[in-house]
A protein has these predicted regions:
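Short, mixed-charge aromatic SLiMs
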Residues: 42-56, 88-95, 236, 307-320, ...
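Extended hydrophobic packing segments that form well-structured cores
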Residues: 410-446
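Accessory "access/gating" subregions that flank catalytic or transport cores
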Residues: 198-330, 438-446
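An N-terminal structural lobe/cap that precedes and organizes the functional/catalytic core
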Residues: 1-14, 36
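Alpha-helical support elements that line or immediately flank enzyme active sites
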Residues: 18-35, 286-298, 343-351
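Hydrophobic alpha-helical bundle architecture
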Residues: 299, 310, 317-389, 401-410
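C-terminal regulatory domains involved in ligand/effector binding and gene-expression control
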Residues: 74-246
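Conserved phosphate/anionic-ligand binding catalytic regions in large, soluble enzymes, centered on
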Residues: 9-27, 268-288, 331-340
Length: 446
């Protein structure tokens, strides 16, 4: 399967790529699959299973399904209008399928969250049914992480032929040696199979623009995050504090943490974010990119493009041979993957060799092994927001540590990813985005 950098970095809304973006896309896909049968539909029923059913209310999965059935997309929905759109459906008991065909919709009956039932293929399963006089269509979808959705027959694979295909770190390094180019160049050449260079660069700078706007929004807003935990936003106050204390020798790392907090507070509030590679870990790559732009002499837009291409290459390997889904392998697959991608991107723009870049990514994966996904209240707030700040700081340190070496190291990226996958398989389900273990049961919700 060919994976583009734009598959890994997609514009969406918070708070979760697997639990918000994925269900919204699945619901819209179901409506599109109705085709000419759409006018015959009298009722639609959606059932969410596994992690989606267990933590879906906290992650906004219910709202996402309503929006997707209404024809909205994560990329284009007006985040400011979402509460009103959802409230209108709930208060009227009516839903306009695909924005074209109005039906009755009783949420208590027609949107079922199964907290302790799972489908066999993946923890994040969904079944949609449409009825006229009889059943018109039934489809099963799985939200497999990062906003990716696959159907019951598997992923609809992109069969694009790439000039330099790779699925492992070893293959990627071999390509770099054969071609005598950095990792970003290998990824760029593959991207040219889909679109011209100018479009690739413009698209990545558009991604960067959304990231920077997300940070700005996070720095401007304060108050309490939605959901009932009464978690207060901290980014705005911390920003003011850092501006008033410019002489602190450790301020660079404080800024990194600040940028991550800003993004993840926006994500927790349902704002516009970029999956990087997931929403739960969306603050790490923007934070490290902001570090590059603010603190690295000679930083440029061209460097941002190289950073994102390099991070994307590592993301391809992680998605193909590991996992970026907290419901599959715990938070090691989300924050761990984002840390690895950010560390690799930073190492390249700081002048690292392909071997040093791969080393930076490996450090990012290795030192998140075993990390659980145990969101308190099923919300992407505790421990998720702070965890992004720590993950971003670790990414900077991983890049710097790799650059102080020559690229040779005992544990390869491929071995670290294999270990992540195996650790995730051994991890109890209660530690994989179900809110039934860890902090989620030891912290009392207020």
């Amino acid at each position: 399967m060919a994976i583009s950098v734009f598959d890994l970095f997609s514009i969406g809304i918070g708070p979760s790529s697997s639990h918000t973006v994925g269900p919204m896309r699945a619901a819209r896909l179901f409506v599109e699959a109705l085709g000419d049968d759409l006018p015959r539909v009298r009722r639609v029923k959606a059932e969410l299973f596994g992690s989606l059913g267990a933590t879906g209310f906290g992650h906004g999965s219910d709202r996402a399904v309503l929006l997707g059935l209404s024809g909205e997309t994560p990329e284009d929905v007006d985040t400011g209008a979402v509460p009103a759109l959802v409230d209108a459906i709930r208060s009227s008991g009516r839903l306009c399928l695909g924005g074209r065909h109005e039906i009755r919709f009783d949420e208590d009956r027609d949107l079922v969250m199964h907290r302790r039932r799972s489908l066999p293929e993946h923890p994040n399963g969904m079944i949609f049914r449409a009825y006229g006089e009889d059943l018109l269509l039934e489809r099963t979808y799985y939200s497999v992480g990062g906003g990716f959705v696959r159907g019951e027959r598997g992923v609809v694979e992109d069969s694009t032929s790439l000039p330099h295909p790779f699925t492992t770190g070893g293959e990627l390094l071999a390509l770099c040696r054969e071609e005598g180019v950095p990792i970003s160049e290998i990824m760029l050449r593959n991207e040219l199979a889909w679109r011209p260079r100018a479009e690739v660069e413009a698209g990545l700078l558009r991604i960067w623009d959304v990231m920077t706007q997300c940070v700005r929004n996070g720095l401007e807003h304060d108050g309490v995050l939605p959901g009932g935990l009464k978690v207060r936003r901290r980014a705005k106050a911390l920003h003011a504090k850092l501006l008033s204390e410019p002489g602190d020798s450790l301020s660079a790392m404080d800024w990194v943490g600040l940028y991550a907090l800003a993004v993840n507070e926006e994500n927790a509030s349902g704002g516009r974010v970029v999956t990087a590679p997931t929403n739960g870990a969306a603050g790490i790559i923007p934070a490290v990119l902001h570090y590059y732009r603010r603190f690295v002499e000679g930083a440029s837009d061209a460097g941002v493009v190289r950073f994102l291409l390099t991070a994307g290459a590592i993301g391809v390997i992680l998605k193909t041979t590991g996992s970026i889904s907290g419901a599959e392998v715990g938070c090691q697959g989300e924050v761990g993957s984002a840390c690895a991608m950010a560390a690799a991107g930073l190492a390249e723009v700081l002048g690292g060799s392909p071997e040093q870049v791969e080393n930076a990514a490996e450090i990012g994966v290795e030192h998140h092994l075993g990390l659980t996904c145990d969101p308190v209240g099923g919300l992407v707030q505790i421990p998720c927001i702070e965890r992004n700040a720590i993950g971003a700081s670790k990414a900077v340190q991983a890049a710097r540590m790799a650059l102080h070496g020559d690229g040779s190291h005992v544990v390869t990226l491929d071995k670290a990813i294999k270990t992540m996958r195996e650790t995730g398989a051994d991890m109890k389900v209660k530690y994989k985005e179900t809110a039934r273990g860890g902090l989620a049961v030891n912290v009392i919700e207020c």
